[in-house]
Amino acid sequence: MISAGDFRNGLTLEIDNAVYQVIEFQHVKPGKGAAFVRTKLRDIKNGGLTERTFRPQEKYPQAHIERSDMQYLYSDGELYNFMNVETFDQIALNDEAVGDSLKFVKENDMVKMLSHQGNVFAIEPPLFVELVIVDTEPGFKGDTAQGATKPAKVETGATVYVPLFVNQGDKISIDTRTGDYMKRV
């Protein structure tokens, strides 16, 4: 059992016979009255978002989530195909199950597949990936005072904002949680 005061992003809970994943949480301590926890929850069965408020002392059972290492094989336009690296079983998922979690993942990269009672509800890419920039405008010295960025398209087709000194053909590290440029590799 987990109390509402211990909620964290990514935590999965069973509430009212449904399984939810905490997307956002905020501890609120008003000047008058009792503290509470404001959350945004995602139903893992249908993907619907719900906002709900809890008292910090309320307790809920944590849902058992299976995490399996999978290799992203390819996309055929409609389905995304993965292979379990231990059993070599292949699984195909549609856009709804995958979402935008693969925008920084290349074919044959490793990901984590999250499922509850056999139903896949999310794909977790690695925290950091290294990708090559395939298209960006050249940056010129003296363009700006400080901290300017420009859009760059990486080999997976996603767009990332990078500093002006990064050029086409450079390999960069990207934080997949935020989509931010981290460093040039």
Swiss-Prot record:
Belongs to the elongation factor P family. Keywords: Cytoplasm, Elongation factor, Protein biosynthesis. Involved in peptide bond synthesis. Stimulates efficient translation and peptide-bond synthesis on native or reconstituted 70S ribosomes in vitro. Probably functions indirectly by altering the affinity of the ribosome for aminoacyl-tRNA, thus increasing their reactivity as acceptors for peptidyl transferase. Signal peptide: none annotated. The keyword Glycoprotein does not apply. CDD domains: S1_EF-P_repeat_1, S1_EF-P_repeat_2. It is found in: Cytoplasm. This is Elongation factor P. It comes from Lachnoclostridium phytofermentans (strain ATCC 700394 / DSM 18823 / ISDg) (Clostridium phytofermentans). GO terms for biological process: peptide biosynthetic process. One of its GO terms (cellular component) is cytoplasm. Disulfide bonds: none annotated. Pathway: Protein biosynthesis; polypeptide chain elongation. Its main location: cytoplasm. One of its GO terms (molecular function) is translation elongation factor activity.
